[in-house]
Structure formats: structure tokens, C-alpha cells
């Protein structure tokens, strides 16, 4: 099953997350199918903190991908900011 979830990157105490479509059997930070966006909780005022490719997210949802609870919350947040 395909899951859209966060894959952690960045340094210690400086998290950075890629929003990825991955097989549910793969590790959190392991192999993924496609990068759909990113989330930077430590972003400065001048930087983008959340970017989501809504077209690709919708594509994966139509093909049966499940969104993790955090990605669902972030997708709603990104849609609200875009509107």
C-alpha cells in the first residue's frame, strides 16, 4: 500500500521533512516513490515553511494512497494558505 508521509532530514535539533509517497513496508526515511513537497518547522520569516504539490497529492489519493494524520493536517494548512 502506498502511504504519503513525512521523511525526516536535516541536522540534529534542526528538523526538515520531505513529504513523500512511499510503500508502507519501507522505512520512514528509506526508499520512496515520489517527493510531493516539504515541511520546514524551523523556517525563518523569509523562508517558505511548507510547500505541497497539490496536483501530485491528489493524483496519489485517487490511486489509493493513504495520508498520514500529520500530512493530512499539513495538506489542509497548505490549501488554506493557497486560497
Swiss-Prot record:
Biological process, per Gene Ontology: translation
GO molecular function, one term: structural constituent of ribosome
This protein's UniProt keywords: Ribonucleoprotein, Ribosomal protein
PROSITE patterns: RIBOSOMAL_S16
Cellular component GO terms, alphabetical: cytoplasm; small ribosomal subunit
Source taxon at top rank: Bacteria
Pfam families xrefs: Ribosomal_S16
PANTHER family (alphabetical): 30S RIBOSOMAL PROTEIN S16, SMALL RIBOSOMAL SUBUNIT PROTEIN BS16M
Family: Belongs to the bacterial ribosomal protein bS16 family.
Protein name per Swiss-Prot or TrEMBL: Small ribosomal subunit protein bS16
Taxonomic source organism: Aromatoleum aromaticum (strain DSM 19018 / LMG 30748 / EbN1)
